[in-house]
Regions:
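DUTPase catalytic domain/fold
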Residues: 1-158
């Protein structure tokens, strides 16, 4: 996920070869490298490596055949592309890939909201990946805070 002025994150592209009982070899397509489509893009687009059919109202977990080597103190978040719902009727929840999941295959969960089969062709972009820092939870003595615990307007009148 290298890009202009962006924190780097190594990407693995997986491909699989397996032999069936008949002796025929099958090859699972290699993952497609994430791409920043514009110079100002905050997230890299991720694509499906092979054709996928999603039945009406079905939820699927699509293996993208990629993995990330995530730096310490960071995680990768998968966000839906805005066109996924508007143009295809698919939703994808925000997903978090923890630093200690580095090197594992990434999957994108998708749900078909429509009454029709939705077909995603190989190479079709379905979500976006963003490398983000995360915070650690620490103990804090809230009694030392001078602000009013009421919330809005808690620091006093303007």
């Amino acid at each position: 996920m290298a890009g202009n002025n962006k924190r780097n994150c190594e990407v693995y592209l997986f491909g699989e070869t397996s032999t069936m009982e008949s002796g025929h070899k099958t090859v699972k397509p290699k993952g497609i490298r994430p791409v920043y489509k514009t110079a100002g893009a905050a997230a890299a687009d991720l694509a499906v490596p092979e054709r996928v059919e999603i039945k009406p109202h079905e939820t699927v977990k699509i293996c993208l055949n990629i993995g990330f080597e995530i730096p310490k103190g960071y995680c990768v978040k998968l966000y839906p592309r805005s066109s996924l719902l508007v143009k295809r009727g698919l939703i994808q929840p925000v997903s978090i890939i923890d630093q200690d999941y580095s090197g594992q295959k990434v999957h994108a969960p998708l749900h078909n909201l429509t009454d029709s089969v939705v077909v995603l062709e190989a190479g079709e972009r379905v979500c976006q990946a963003m490398l983000e820092p995360y915070f650690d939870v620490v103990d804090w003595d809230h009694e030392q805070n001078e602000r009013d615990p009421a919330g809005f307007g808690g620091s006093g009148r303007v």
